[in-house]
């Protein structure tokens, strides 16, 4: 009986030793290297986001992606040696969502549809994007090393800001103005580094004054080498009589609930602004403020029923948190 017990203990010890060796072999087969990421926000934005997400995608699908949320200043990660494509973007945005994150080629930022506004037609529009800062690296090699690799990175804003003022007559008959822009990028391919237009108008709020309407809106940046955003539907682009056009749409909801619509082609001005370039300090050159020609005013027809004596309630057009970026008055031709 004693011999049986002794034999069992010897067998158990041998199994534990083999398990330990096997586990050590596995760890040796899958080593990791330390990566220390430092993020520089100087000249990017004064209003830092909450933090960033960093994703290492193995090249050619060899291995698993390494994914971690870091502070806005960066942090350390453990990454197996190999060749990777990398994306970095800020998280906890208000309107921006992420999809297609399973691969470097498909990860994309977008905004959802404008549901819940209670205004007919807005459910087909999408929200304007808030601030998004990204970095994409097509190939980065991580060597096997016990030394921590330091990576100094700087993200770039991929959301462009615009403003415009349009003179109009008959605004006393208007309760609300709904604005949208069609033809700008409403989503952004982070890995590919380009904006994409899916033919969904981008909604924005409009402020109604005595004789003009003003608004601020945002859109994802377009690819730098192109003057127009890439369309998702080739067939729609080929059959459209206004392919590539960027159209500003204003819907004047009058006091009798009827709607009068005005459309303005701003293609040439948008293209010029997208290619404004940078100054000697490396910052974007401020675009010129262009006054609206008097002959291009919009006139809202008088409704069949008298306006509300208390006055119509317009949608607020104030936007907080705008920095010294691209704010421009667009002309109407």
UniProtKB/Swiss-Prot annotation:
GO CC terms, sorted: cell outer membrane
Domain of life: Bacteria
Covalent lipid adducts (S-diacylglycerol cysteine), residues: 21
Residue ranges with Gly residues bias: 310-320
Pfam family, one: DUF5119
Keyword entries, A-Z: Cell outer membrane, Lipoprotein, Membrane, Palmitate, Signal
Residues where lipid is bound covalently (N-palmitoyl cysteine): 21
Residues in the signal sequence: 1-20
Region (Disordered): 274-333
Main location, first listed in the record: membrane
Topological category with respect to the lipid bilayer: Lipid-anchor
UniProt subcellular location: Cell outer membrane
Ranges of biased composition (kind: Basic and acidic residues): 294-304
Family as reported in the entry's similarity comment: Belongs to the bacteroidetes fimbrillin superfamily. FimB/Mfa2 family.
Known role: Putative fimbrium anchoring subunit.
Protein name per its UniProtKB record: Putative fimbrium anchoring subunit Fim4B
Natural source organism: Bacteroides ovatus (strain ATCC 8483 / DSM 1896 / JCM 5824 / BCRC 10623 / CCUG 4943 / NCTC 11153)
Taxonomic lineage from the root: Bacteria, Pseudomonadati, Bacteroidota, Bacteroidia, Bacteroidales
